[in-house]
């Protein structure tokens, strides 16, 4: 990765992000957009929507064009019976950017959105300036057991119960009570965000889309689609990894494994943060993103170099870090439970 002296772009007063819609392949795609300059695409996680970025969107838009979409099946985008795999989501992001006439982008992905961001970089490297992974899914199969259980048939039935009168309010009240009791623990840290996401699930098409999305990436054993076998392909792309130490959805060791598997990547750990570090410390998150944008050159797509890299492959020589981390990465790459796209 090429670093450069920090290039400070002018800060402008800009209008707040506006909610807009485009129809792509017959489906309505919602997104929030603000600012001008180099483009940043913010991709949210499963069950979430573009408003999750509200604390950082407007500030970043003072220096960049910032687009935060609602993924298909989420927020105010349509929720059809469709393909909700990470590859399909990456295709959808490519198509939305094309409709918006945006040729290249720095892609920021949180949770499931991190997996989508990695898949986007894998499928469309010619469109990627930089890659920022925030508590990203798809590093190894490990994921919180709640998601494993929710991927089972009984999980869909449990989500259907949320549509019954008074069930969701009761769950939210119970959650707040539990949150007060465990608020200082890792589990309690992210509970408000979990309750916020639950607000959307009683709507039938939203809960169905959530279930399809979850089952596309998780089963009872954990995450089915992992990125470690292809991380070496980011060799020519500037990569920033951000994670919280109290993340109970995707443990912070995933950050160190991804960092070890991505040559030249940068790593920032938010001490005391949970699964949403950009909520816990938005000012620090903004500073990291801006500094990363300012001190790295956009990736230069070289088809011949990519072809040579693919032929050479990854393996032990491309993994860095401590001995324990390297062993963990290589063991995960060699696992027969891994499924690549």
Curated annotation (Swiss-Prot):
The active site is at residues 111, 247, 275. It comes from the Bacteria. GO terms for cellular component: plasma membrane. Keywords: Hydrolase. GO terms for molecular function: hydrolase activity. The keyword Hydrolase applies. InterPro entries: AB_hydrolase_1 (IPR000073), AB_hydrolase_fold (IPR029058), AB_hydrolase_sf (IPR050266), Epox_hydrolase-like (IPR000639). Belongs to the DmpD/TodF/XylF esterase family. This is Uncharacterized protein Rv2715.
């Amino acid at each position: 990765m090429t670093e450069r002296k920090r290039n400070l772009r002018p800060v402008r007063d800009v209008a707040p992000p506006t909610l807009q819609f485009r129809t792509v392949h017959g489906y309505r795609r919602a997104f929030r957009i603000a600012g001008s300059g180099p483009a940043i695409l913010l991709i949210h996680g499963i069950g979430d929507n573009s408003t999750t970025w509200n604390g950082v969107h407007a500030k970043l838009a003072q220096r960049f064009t910032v687009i935060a979409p609602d993924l298909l099946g989420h927020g105010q985008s349509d929720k059809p019976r469709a393909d909700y795999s990470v590859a399909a989501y990456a295709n959808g992001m490519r198509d939305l950017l094309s409709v918006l006439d945006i040729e290249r982008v720095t892609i920021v992905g949180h949770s499931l959105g991190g997996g989508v961001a990695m898949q986007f970089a894998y499928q469309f490297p010619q469109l990627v300036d930089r890659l920022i992974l925030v508590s990203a899914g798809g590093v190894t199969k490990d994921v919180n057991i709640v998601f494993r259980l929710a991927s089972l048939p009984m999980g869909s039935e449990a989500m259907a119960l949320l549509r019954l009168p008074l069930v969701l309010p009761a769950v939210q009240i119970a959650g707040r009570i539990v949150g007060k009791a465990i608020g200082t623990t890792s589990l309690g840290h992210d509970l408000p965000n979990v309750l916020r996401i639950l607000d959307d699930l009683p709507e039938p098409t939203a809960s169905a889309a959530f279930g399809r999305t979850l089952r596309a990436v998780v089963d009872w054993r954990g995450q089915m689609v992992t990125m470690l076998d292809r991380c070496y392909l980011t060799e020519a792309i500037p990569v920033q990894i951000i994670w919280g130490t109290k993340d109970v959805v995707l443990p912070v060791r995933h950050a160190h494994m991804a960092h070890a598997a991505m040559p030249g990547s940068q790593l920032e750990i938010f001490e005391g943060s949970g699964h949403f570090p950009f909520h816990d410390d938005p000012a620090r998150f903004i500073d990291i993103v801006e500094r990363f944008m300012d001190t790295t050159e956009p990736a230069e797509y070289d088809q011949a170099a990519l072809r040579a890299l693919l032929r050479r492959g990854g393996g032990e020589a491309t993994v860095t870090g401590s001995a324990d981390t390297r062993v963990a990465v290589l063991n995960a790459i060699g696992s027969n439970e891994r499924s690549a796209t």
